[in-house]
Amino acid sequence: MNIGSLNSVIEALRENLQFNKLFISTSRRDHRIDKVIKLCREKNVVFQMVPEEAITRKAGEDHQGVYAELSPIRFYSIEEIVSNRKKGLILILDSITDTGNLGAIIRSAVAADVDGIIISLRNSAPINETVLKTSAGTLVKAKIVQSGNLSQDIKYLKENDFWVVGTVMERDKSIPYYKFDFTVNTAIVMGNEFKGVSPLLQKNSDQLVYIPHSEAIDSLNVSAAAAVLLFEALRQKG
């Protein structure tokens, strides 16, 4: 993965990710550039000071005076997530296609201290620099599972004492999210930006919930909706 965001580089350094290359502009100086240099020296990460135009050639115009090439992000297995759980809170993302939404959801999930994020491999946004940037660098702290079959993963979670909560817009077959008892082991399913949670995953959910909102809008953005549910779960869990 290649990144040109200062916050992303700083988080990657803090999390001891493997840097293949790191270039820093000789013409930029601010406290975050100084922080990058300090962290590199503390963690023995090799970096090169280069002219600004050298970074622009690699990263394009949209960079912040740094450019890094990272080794691939580590992904986890669902078994690792379940066996090492602390909060008993997992987020399942069913075909989230927008990288901005994915990054924002990951940021909220890390802030809510989830044990892991399960992302469908098919019809989902790629894990790339945009996701890293919109997550404000928190992608490197997230424990992500790439799933080839969300239905099988949900079955596994149920077998390991998780309640699966699907989010929907329809109120006739669901309850308000705040009436669900999130103190139990919970896996929250968020659906595609346009289609929502698939009918199969709705059927496989133990409970469907909705978020009450003004009639002035049809629905919340999926990243906003995820934040609402995650922080209600965090509040209840204490």
Q: Language model features by range: what are they?
A:
Residues V165-N221:
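Active-site/ligand-binding-proximal alpha/beta "capping" segment
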Residues E11-R14, S83-I175:
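RNA substrate-binding interface of SAM-dependent RNA methyltransferases
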Residues M1-S83:
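N-terminal positively charged helical leader segments and presequences
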Residues N16, K133-T138, P199-G238:
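Structured adenosyl-cofactor binding patch, chiefly the S-adenosyl-L-methionine
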Residues M1, S25, D94-S95, S120, ...:
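Glycine- and other small-residue-rich loops at beta-strand/loop junctions that grip anionic moieties
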Residues F47-P51, K143-S151, V209:
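Short acidic-hydrophobic, aromatic-tinged amphipathic segments that line or gate anion-handling sites
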Residues S27-R28, E52-E53, R122-S124, E193-K195, ...:
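Short, acidic/turn-prone active-site loops that include or flank metal/cofactor-
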